[in-house]
């Protein structure tokens, strides 16, 4: 919900799983959120930006989280396509 100024005023904004696009429930204590830092290719230093991936507990329970994170990282260009 937004107020007249266009700011979000909700107390709880649900997250979505990056792999399955499911809403991560508030009581899903098995879910994770990980930030992968973007680095400068020439210097190898952190440039202040990162990619955020959220994985729900159901994906982790099936043992598919590592494949999902690798697939998402390849799509974002963090990992090379021929890895």
Swiss-Prot record:
Q: Does the keyword Metal-binding apply?
A: no
Disulfide connectivity for this sequence is: none
According to its record, what are the GO cellular component terms? cytosolic small ribosomal subunit; rough endoplasmic reticulum
Q: Annotated Gene Ontology MF terms?
A: ribosome binding; structural constituent of ribosome
Q: Which UniProt keywords apply?
A: Acetylation, Cytoplasm, Endoplasmic reticulum, Ribonucleoprotein, Ribosomal protein
Classification via InterPro entries: Ribosomal_eS21 (IPR001931), Ribosomal_eS21_CS (IPR018279), Ribosomal_eS21_sf (IPR038579)
Question: Where in or outside the cell?
Answer: Cytoplasm, Cytosol; Cytoplasm; Rough endoplasmic reticulum
Q: Give the Gene3D superfamilies listed for this entry.
A: 3.30.1230.20
Q: Which residues carry this modification: N-acetylmethionine?
A: 1
The Gene Ontology biological process terms listed for this entry are:
cytoplasmic translation; endonucleolytic cleavage in ITS1 to separate SSU-rRNA from 5.8S rRNA and LSU-rRNA from tricistronic rRNA transcript (SSU-rRNA, 5.8S rRNA, LSU-rRNA); endonucleolytic cleavage to generate mature 3'-end of SSU-rRNA from (SSU-rRNA, 5.8S rRNA, LSU-rRNA)
Q: Which residues carry this modification: N6-acetyllysine?
A: 81
Q: State the oligomer form and interacting partners.
A: Component of the 40S small ribosomal subunit.
Return the similarity comment.
Answer: Belongs to the eukaryotic ribosomal protein eS21 family.
What protein name is recorded for this chain? Answer: Small ribosomal subunit protein eS21
Origin organism is Rattus norvegicus (Rat)
């Amino acid at each position: 919900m937004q107020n007249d100024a266009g700011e979000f005023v909700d107390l709880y904004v649900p997250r979505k799983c990056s792999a399955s696009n499911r809403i991560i429930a508030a009581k899903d204590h098995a879910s994770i959120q990980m930030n992968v830092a973007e680095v400068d290719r020439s210097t190898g230093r952190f440039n202040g930006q990162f990619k955020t991936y959220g994985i729900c507990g159901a994906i982790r329970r099936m043992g598919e989280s590592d494949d999902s994170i690798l697939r998402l990282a390849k799509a974002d260009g963090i990992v090379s396509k021929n890895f």
